[in-house]
């Protein structure tokens, strides 16, 4: 009900009805009042005219009695005529009740003294009570000199007339006026409702459009063909709606691009408002915050507070869960609505860069050590031979053998470095052939039989001699040589090294398993990285360059396969090679 009363249509309709009703009431009151006044005045004028004629007739006549009788025939109500010579000496015995009351009014009302004393015409409304009802009469006193007396200058011609006819006429006019007003009001009501509905129809359309715009629907654009202010308003609103749609689309596009860029960033991004609440974050930041420890959280909060205080960009290093991050916090004047300031936090994972830098340092140290050792041996033994320190043929032969071994070792080291450089520049070429896997594993068995016996290792091969794989013999020889050499370094006498074949629906699988020292969990994710080397204190024998497993991974991936490692510290390590089956 209240919503209907709040409608513009109802308000406009009620306003028009109220105005028209007020005007009709005022006009009706004015008309009725005027008609009452008009008929009263007309009646008074008519009575006055009758009184004047009677006064003139009586004054000019010699026979007063005949003149009075004749005068009674001239007026509408002959019984309403009274000619009073002296109002103080009038007998009321033969008068009717009405005339008695009229005579009493003349005698007792001081206004009528002006008729006798000043010769003025006086009119008064007199209410007569008769038979339990009241009736209003108009009583007019008109001066005349028809009969002289010693008490006053003038006599008086008094005529009274019943106003019931005027009241009936006024009542009829009132009823007609009210009926006319009601009819006019009814017509006005219908017309006003139609007019207000028609006028407000464009406004209702604009309201519907505004509601849809507030809900994000900009497609609805009402057509208002009028040329008035409402039509102009509709055109302006349609134009505004179109511009809002364009701006919203632009903002939405910008937001989508921004969100896509932020979510695609490798850095974690956080938006912090003045209340220290996160109002913006990407996936990387969510992952970091899910795994953050209390110390790192306290570190981050301190840096955010420092940025709020200094309003300057802060950049600090953070180490958490064996990973390394660079945290950058920047102060922003307006980060959300209302002009509130905030801080944007950028967390960049620098673990790979840190590890790569560390690996480069280790690589330089290892390569320097690896190069220095054979070079020192080559120099020492050759100087011994050249200087004649070693003269016995057997000693010379032994020294030359050592020189040869160190030369081969130096050559192998240089070849590994050259292979990596060549693979980076030209890529790795693999010539796969469908051939028995036994050909490769038999070769490995012969190659490492003596080494296993010398090291006290139990090396076993378990494979199906008839099974054929698709692989490059030389490249896979390089892979297995590296893996078995690594297994030999991380084992002790009595440990086992097992090479086993298996398969699934789409892949051939090769396991190289040892029961050696194993690899710590923090190293597992990096063993295939370039230049990476596990703790040298747990290895036995000569050290490599940290390129072997990196080269193995490149070879296996070039075959279209994968290589993985599983290890448990103190229990051993298993390398798993998967190659696609021959088509």
From Swiss-Prot:
Induction: Up-regulated during anaerobic growth. Gene3D superfamilies: 1.10.287.130, 6.10.340.10, Histidine kinase-like ATPase, C-terminal domain (3.30.565.10). GO terms for biological process: osmosensory signaling via phosphorelay pathway. Signal peptide: none annotated. This is Sensor protein SrrB. PANTHER family: HISTIDINE PROTEIN KINASE SAES, TWO-COMPONENT HISTIDINE KINASE. The gene is srrB. Member of the two-component regulatory system SrrA/SrrB, which is involved in the global regulation of staphylococcal virulence factors in response to environmental oxygen levels as well as biofilm formation. Also plays an essential role in host-derived nitric oxide resistance by regulating hmp/flavohemoglobin, an enzyme that detoxifies nitric oxide by converting it to nitrate. Functions as a sensor protein kinase which is autophosphorylated at a histidine residue and transfers its phosphate group to SrrA. The keyword Membrane applies. It is a multi-pass membrane protein. The modification Phosphohistidine is found at residue 369.
């Amino acid at each position: 009900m209240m919503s209907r009363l709040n409608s513009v249509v109802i308000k406009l309709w009620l306003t028009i009805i109220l105005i028209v009703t007020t005007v009709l009431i005022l006009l009706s009151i004015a008309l009725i009042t005027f008609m009452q006044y008009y008929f009263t005045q007309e009646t008074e004028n008519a009575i006055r005219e009758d009184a004047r004629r009677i006064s003139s007739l009586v004054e000019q006549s010699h026979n007063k009695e005949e003149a009075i009788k004749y005068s009674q025939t001239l007026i509408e109500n002959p019984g309403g005529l009274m000619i009073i010579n002296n109002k103080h000496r009038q007998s009321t015995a033969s008068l009717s009740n009405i005339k008695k009351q009229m005579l009493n009014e003349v005698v007792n009302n001081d206004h009528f003294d002006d008729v006798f004393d000043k010769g003025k015409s006086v009119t008064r409304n007199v209410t007569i009570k008769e038979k339990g009802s009241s009736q209003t009469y108009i009583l007019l006193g008109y001066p005349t000199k028809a009969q002289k007396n010693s008490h006053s200058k003038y006599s008086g011609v008094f005529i009274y007339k019943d106003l019931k006819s005027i009241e009936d006429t006024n009542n009829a006019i009132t009823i007609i006026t009210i009926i006319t007003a009601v009819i006019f009001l009814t017509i006005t009501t219908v017309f006003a409702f139609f007019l207000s509905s028609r006028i407000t129809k464009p406004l209702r359309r604009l309201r519907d459009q505004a509601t849809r715009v507030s809900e994000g629907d900009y497609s609805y654009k009402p057509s208002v063909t009028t040329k008035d202010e409402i039509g102009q308003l509709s055109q302006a609103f349609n134009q505004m709606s179109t511009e809002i749609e364009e701006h919203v689309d632009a903002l939405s596009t910008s937001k989508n691009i921004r969100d896509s860029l932020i979510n695609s960033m490798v850095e974690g991004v956080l938006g912090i408002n003045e209340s220290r609440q996160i109002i913006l974050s990407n996936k990387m930041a969510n992952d970091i915050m899910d795994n953050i420890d209390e110390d790192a959280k306290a570190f981050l909060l301190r840096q955010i507070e420092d940025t709020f205080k200094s309003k300057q960009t802060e950049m600090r290093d953070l180490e958490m869960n064996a990973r390394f991050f660079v945290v950058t916090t920047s102060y922003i004047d307006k980060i959300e609505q209302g002009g509130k300031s905030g801080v944007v936090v950028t967390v960049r994972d620098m673990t790979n860069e840190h590890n790569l830098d560390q690996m480069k340092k280790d690589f330089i140290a290892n390569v320097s050590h690896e190069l220095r050792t054979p070079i020192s041996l080559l120099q020492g033994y050759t100087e011994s031979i050249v200087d004649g320190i070693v003269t016995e043929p057997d000693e010379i032969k032994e020294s030359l053998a050592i020189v040869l071994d160190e030369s081969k070792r130096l050559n192998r080291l240089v070849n590994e470095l050259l292979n990596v450089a060549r693979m980076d520049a030209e890529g790795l070429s693999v010539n796969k052939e469908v051939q028995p896997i036994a050909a490769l594993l038999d070769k490995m068995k012969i190659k490492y039989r003596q080494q296993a016996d010398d090291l006290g290792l139990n090396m076993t091969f378990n494979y199906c001699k008839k099974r054929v794989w698709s692989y490059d013999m030389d490249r896979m020889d390089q892979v297995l040589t590296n893996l078995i050499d690594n297994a030999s370094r991380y084992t002790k006498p009595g440990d086992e090294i097992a090479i086993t074949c298996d398969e699934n629906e789409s892949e051939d699988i090769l396991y190289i398993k040892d029961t050696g020292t194993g690899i710590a969990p923090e190293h597992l994710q990096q063993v295939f990285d370039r230049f990476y080397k596990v703790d040298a204190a747990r290895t036995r024998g000569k050290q490599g360059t940290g390129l072997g497993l990196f080269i193995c991974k490149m070879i296996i991936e070039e075959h279209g396969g994968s290589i993985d490692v599983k290890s448990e510290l103190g229990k051993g390590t298993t390398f798993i090679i998967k190659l696609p089956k021959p088509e």
